[in-house]
Amino acid sequence: MVRFIFVTGGVVSSLGKGLTAASLAMLLQAKGFKVCVRKLDPYLNVDPGTMNPHEHGEVYVTDDGAETDLDLGHYERFTGVSSCKFDSITTGAIYSKLLKDERLGNYTGVTVQIIPHVTNIIKDFILSNTKGFDFIICEIGGTVGDIEGLPFFEAIRQIGNKLKNENCLFIHLTLLPYVKTARELKTKPTQHSVKELRAIGITPNILVCRAERNISKSEIDKIALFCNIESEYVIPAIDQKNIYLVPIAYHNSGLDNKVLKFFNINVVPSKLDKWYDIIGRLKDSSSKVRIAIIAKYHKLKDAYKSVIEALDHAGIYYKYKIDLVWINAENLTEENINKKLLNIDGILVPGGFGERATKGKITAITYARTNNIPFFGICFGMQLATIEIAQNLIGIKDAVTEEFKVDGTKIIEKINKNCEGSKITIENVKKTMRLGSYPCSLVANTIAANAYKSLEINERHRHRYKFNNEFQNIFEKNGVVFSGFSKDEEIVEIIELPELRWFVGVQFHPEFKSKPFEAHPLFIQFIKAAIEYTLRK
């Protein structure tokens, strides 16, 4: 029978519930169990697909096209198991279903309420699609005490009451703030957080305590006493220099074995060789390579979370530290670019939407191309690369993208024109988006084919514009190689400039499929080119 583990948080947000859930999933997986990790978000948006990155950070896209929270990226990167649309839900999606059912008369005229109707939808989500799994780990977004989170806490309380301890475990993550003047960790916020959780009917079985320094036995005993929990189930979560050190830190703290003990499951050895290899590679990484990310949201690193991690994975592969240099694309000009990109070994332009900051991105692409610096353009970054090539290499000075609704030669066009001229609504914005994993055919003897070591691949997408194929011939005459196409050959997936050191643009998002123990081949080749470039300088 499947067992359920609920991960909640208290005191402050952004404590690392997602990393805790992902780490525990990996540790249980290392003991031979099949684990699924899910995220329940209390916000009223149906999904994060139309949210500003400043509000939410990265939108993580699954194989089946779900636009989800960035924590699902942690789940996939730690476990190597692909998430799907059944692994993410929001209050907005719940209310959307509830109100649709109410209008259809599915509630047969009864008064629709938070309890039981909203909580029943939450419970159905948690308890459905569990076949083949030994554990379902559910992360509840937000912190205990948040008004918007109350229906979720009530739903998991009901599940816990029904399944009992044999099949349900509550893990609560809290913060132990360190007060420098007193030179001690403060346990009172944790005590109040647990009190708040118990007030709504949930008693945590395991308490995970975040802290910036080691937690003494006396402090653990104090927490256990006031929170009514055994000391062995108070797990330290000390700050780590790298997130890929977190799973082994939890293993050393005994989190995985405590979970098995709670469920009366025999403790079995863990197969953690690949994670110890990652730790070894991180420790051996002494050399650095400097990568400039030309970003629109340069102050919000979470907007590019998967890109950052994919670069780190390639760094782990080569035992190199990736020194990221964040460049504000809005302030990048021909006059200051030499200074801002001084001693850069590689330039990456990530995905995005909208006209703002595109001039600076194109300036960076020109700089990379004309100075033969390794360049990687992702999604919108590839589209801007084709515009830069059209303007400055081919001579189509008015080359533009149809997205900006300005006059000029449309090098980039809409994929689906069915909604053209219609009012822009959330509904038709979704309809015109190409989302999820699609097959891609590669051309032999190209940079892409050599990187993948295959001519057939699958990659994840999130875009509604594509390269205008009418210009393919003139681009090819000017040295551009189109090395990847959709199966129907309608959409250009990869472009290359083979005469340069490394210049590649991709329409998809390779960062979503990179893992610390299996770096993405394109990121591997990009970092390889950057390393070779820095060694030759």
Curated annotation (Swiss-Prot):
Gene Ontology process terms (BP): 'de novo' CTP biosynthetic process; pyrimidine nucleobase biosynthetic process
Binding locations of Mg(2+): D71, E139
Binding site residues for CTP: S13, D146, I147, E148, K186, T187, K188, P189, T190, Q191, K222
Positions annotated to bind UTP: S13, K186, T187, K188, P189, T190, Q191, K222
GO cellular component assignments: cytoophidium; cytoplasm
Domain of life: Bacteria
UniProt keyword annotations, A-Z: ATP-binding, Glutamine amidotransferase, Ligase, Magnesium, Metal-binding, Nucleotide-binding, Pyrimidine biosynthesis
EC code(s) of this entry: 6.3.4.2
A Pfam family hit: GATase
Record-listed L-glutamine binding positions: G352, F380, G381, M382, Q383, E403, R464
Any one Gene Ontology molecular-function term assigned to this protein's record: metal ion binding
Chemical reaction(s) catalysed: UTP + L-glutamine + ATP + H2O = CTP + L-glutamate + ADP + phosphate + 2 H(+); L-glutamine + H2O = L-glutamate + NH4(+); UTP + NH4(+) + ATP = CTP + ADP + phosphate + 2 H(+)
HAMAP family associated with the record: PyrG
Protein name per its UniProtKB record: CTP synthase
Organism: Rickettsia felis (strain ATCC VR-1525 / URRWXCal2)
